[in-house]
């Protein structure tokens, strides 16, 4: 009898263990977070530089034409220490920034400012764009600088082969895209965020948030890379709809995009797999106001504009 009971007992224990032991979790892992607050006042963009990050600040809540407050400045944060690299005095509306070598390009209203980061105390070179263009974001690819104007819906290119001498460089119209926000370039492809279509004749139940891409940078044409309807049809979920995407950056291996998402009640950080085009939320917080983010040192740095901080997410 014992010979028959022993195998049965072992099988019984196996079944019980399957029921009791926890199954592997498929829930998303919340990344470790920290924040930078020292000196930050209305920051809209962060970029990596020399083992740290450059943080652009308005210094004031006013960032519209006609509000002539020269309060903008650039911070540099490295190894837990923050210093003012470019103090107030020139910049009015430093929104997007980009770096090539030791040169910093700053979108400043209708002006593009070019600073030598080894000598930030020197006056910047200035390229003034024709009105009514209002500069939003910047991205570098080799010797080309891309600059977006969100109020008109235009992306420009500038030749930055010789950033030390920009006096004869003129911006060239490159791509028209209504509501253009931010850009990320890698492996010969540009990815773009833009405001969703709106207006009195637009059916809001069909409005989509779209990530655009340009596959041929020499012959630019915007095409939809990813789209998702703003309204899902679920009344509970639609109380916190995604209003628009803003910041966008490539992962260090160029296999994914990280995107900032402005929602009705929360702000969220999304990751979009470039190969599968699957999107998921990696971080969400009530009141988060995420702008143009960047990735460096296996972490995301996200300017949280209205909350006067830069959020750091460990990846």
Where are these regions (language model features)?
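Bacterial N-terminal signal peptides
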Residues: 9-20
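A short beta-strand motif characteristic of beta-propeller blades
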Residues: 31-37, 81-87, 122-128, 167-174, ...
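Conserved beta-strand positions in repeat-built beta-propeller and related beta-rich domains
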Residues: 39, 55-68, 105-111, 147-152, ...
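Beta-rich, blade/repeat-based domains predominating
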Residues: 39-50, 71, 88-103, 129-142, ...
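A short loop-to-beta-strand structural motif that recurs across blades of beta-propeller domains
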Residues: 66, 70-75, 111-113, 154-156, ...
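Short loop/turn segments that connect beta-strands within beta-propeller blades
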Residues: 77-81, 116-121, 159-164, 215-219, ...
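Hydrophobic alpha-helical segments and helix pairs
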Residues: 114-159
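Blade-level signature of beta-propeller repeat domains, shared across WD40, Kelch, NHL, RCC1
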Residues: 292-315
């Amino acid at each position: 009898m014992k010979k028959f009971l022993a195998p049965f007992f072992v099988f019984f224990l196996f079944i019980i263990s399957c029921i009791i032991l926890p199954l592997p979790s498929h829930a998303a892992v919340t990344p470790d977070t920290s924040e930078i607050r020292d000196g930050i006042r209305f920051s809209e963009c962060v970029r990596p530089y020399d083992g740290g990050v450059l943080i652009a600040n308005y210094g004031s809540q006013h960032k519209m034409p006609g509000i002539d407050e020269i309060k903008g400045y650039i911070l540099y944060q490295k190894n837990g220490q923050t210093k003012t690299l470019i103090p107030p005095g020139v910049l009015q509306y430093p929104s997007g920034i980009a770096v090539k070598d030791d040169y910093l390009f700053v979108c400043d209203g209708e002006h593009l400012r070019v600073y030598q980061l080894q000598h930030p105390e020197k006056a910047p070179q200035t390229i003034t764009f024709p009105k009514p263009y209002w500069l939003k974001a910047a991205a570098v690819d080799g010797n080309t600088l891309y600059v977006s104007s969100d109020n008109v819906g235009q992306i420009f290119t500038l030749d930055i082969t010789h950033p030390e001498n920009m006096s004869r460089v003129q911006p060239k119209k490159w791509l028209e895209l209504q509501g253009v926000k931010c850009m990320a370039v890698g492996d010969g492809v540009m990815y773009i965020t833009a405001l969703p279509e709106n207006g009195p004749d637009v059916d809001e139940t069909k409005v989509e948030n779209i990530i655009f891409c340009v596959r041929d940078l020499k012959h630019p044409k915007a095409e939809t890379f990813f789209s998702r309807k703003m309204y899902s049809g679920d009344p509970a979920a639609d109380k916190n709809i995604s209003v628009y995407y803003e910041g966008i950056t490539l992962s260090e291996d160029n296999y994914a995009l990280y995107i900032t998402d402005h929602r009705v009640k929360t702000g969220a950080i999304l990751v979009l797999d470039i190969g599968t085009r699957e999107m998921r939320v990696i971080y969400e917080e009530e009141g988060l106001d995420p702008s143009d983010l960047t990735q460096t040192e296996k972490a995301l740095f996200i300017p949280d504009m209205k909350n006067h901080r830069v959020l750091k997410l460990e990846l």
